[in-house]
Every structure is written in C-alpha cells, then in structure tokens.
C-alpha cells in the first residue's frame, strides 16, 4: 500500500478514536452535533477495522519473514507468507473501495436507456444493452423492475427506464453513464456497409425520500394518457399512464408500467426527484473537482464513453483507453470485464490526487 495512503489512514485512525471519545461524552454535545459525529464515526468504523487488521498482518509478515532463515521451517513459512499476503491484498482492496467511495454509492439506482442517432438500428441497440444489463443484474442475483418503456418500430426500445432496488447498485453501475456507440452491419443492410448507431445511458441514484428536497406542486404539470405496447397499440382502455413535467427545468418523466394511475404517478415522481437531485449533485461535483468529470464523465448524454465494434468483436472504453475482445461475453452480461478496470483506474486517480495534495 502506498505510503501516502498509509499516512492518510493513520490520520483517519486518530480521528476515529477522537470521535469515539467525543461520542462517549454525549452530555457535552448537542443533538445536531451528535448526529453529525455519529455519521462520521459510522463511515470510519469499517475503514479503521480493516486498517487495523492490515497493520496486524503487516507485523505478522515481518515476523514470519525472520523465520525464513530456518531451513527446516522454510516451506511452511513460505506457505504462511502466501496466506498472509493474500489476506493483506484483500484488505487493501476493501479499504480502497471504502475510502474512495462516493456517499451516493450505497443507494440503489435507476438506469435510463435512450436510443440516439441511427433510427431503428439505435432502438435495436438500446434493446441489446437492456438485455446486457438484465443479464448482469441476474448474474449478481439482484432484481429489477421496468418503470417505463417506449418500444422501437422494429424491436428494441426508443426509451426504457429500469429500477435496480439493491443496496449499492448505484456504486457498481455509475460508470455506465454516457454515450454508447455501436459499429456493425445491420441485418437490413444489403450492401454490407458498416453503420454507426448510438444509445445514451444515465445511471441515477435512487435517493431516499427523507433526503430528497420537496418539489413545489405548482412547478409540476401532470398529464395522463393510455398505456401503449410494442408497435404503438393501446394496451389499456383507461388513462392510467402518467407524464410528469418539472416546469422550471423542463425535465419530464413518463410511467405506464402499472395499471394503476396512482402507482404510475408515484414511480414517475420518484424518478423525477432523483433526476433533479442528481443534477444538483453533479453541479456541485463539477465545481469541486475535475476527477469525476474526467473519469466518470459529465453524465452528459453526448459523452461517448464506449464503442462496441461487432465486426472486430471488441469493446473499447474511451475514458481509460481499455479494449476487450470479449464482446460476446460482455453483451451476455459479463460486464465486470469493463467495470473492474475503470473502478481500479478511478481509485488510482483519486490516490494520485491525494498524493499531489500532500
């Protein structure tokens, strides 16, 4: 582990025990301060627990290495060192994940997929990305629900919004936000020409209602209409589908998944609130640091983050110049092939920033 990071953790350890002392003397602090200190203490608790385990293992490694000179014990000591080093490495990964996590990483999320340029082919591509995420979610043993879907004329989706109600799913999937581009020969192409189509993804944290700001009802316009299925046919005889527009920002959300107008309204409002919250958070982050903007992207749908080239069987993530030739596996849900490298790069970038600040 980098010396700068160890020094940072030593500093956090001192802070953690100082917090414990203050919280034990709760009569000397008011309720608001107690809540704030408790929140910080909870955040540091797991980090310090793993760090203290790491320090103990580090001591054991030094002590065990001293025994290598004993010829009779050499093989046993080597095996013990392998076990200790594996444990040490695992703890370092856990510490980095906790230390460099975003406060919103703990939340579940919405994934919005929208077909971009490319017409019918873009909608088909959006459908394939939806299948990719569905398979990934299934592999993680998570669950999901469709909030809203507008079907493409030849299959796929013009737009689809899904909810992944699993703790920490936002932190796992947030790097998917941005523009996804596909290069391939469509089935409808008779001359064998490669076409380029795009789909935009937005991964939004589903913030608990207790944290979300209230929206003035006068700022909302609510429209009702009949739900429609693939091909545009109406699948409901009542106006159960809902469209909510936030007038000041111009943001709008549709929901037609439920037969109940009340349930559709509740779901649409939840998505709208999360979108507005995400925009506010993004603005603050852009003011504070370039790290997120450079690596995760601005969240702007025009950011091209990834290209899927079917002719060459490759996927390239442009943010970290990473290319994999396992396109088939990725499209079948093995998304960790792409997620893990960018998460590692993100941690390395934050550590580098920490070093420069030091």
UniProtKB/Swiss-Prot annotation:
Record Pfam families: PCRF (PF03462), RF-1 (PF00472)
Presence of keyword Cytoplasm: yes
One MF term in the entry's GO annotations: translation release factor activity, codon specific
Entry's localization field: Cytoplasm
GO CC annotations, alphabetized: cytoplasm
Keywords: Cytoplasm, Methylation, Protein biosynthesis
Predominant localisation class: cytoplasm
Modification comment: Methylated by PrmC. Methylation increases the termination efficiency of RF1.
Annotated SMART domains: PCRF (SM00937)
Modified residues (N5-methylglutamine): 233
Keyword Protein biosynthesis found: yes
NCBIfam families assigned: prfA (TIGR00019), PRK00591.1 (NF001859)
Purpose of the protein: Peptide chain release factor 1 directs the termination of translation in response to the peptide chain termination codons UAG and UAA.
Family: Belongs to the prokaryotic/mitochondrial release factor family.
The protein, known as: Peptide chain release factor 1
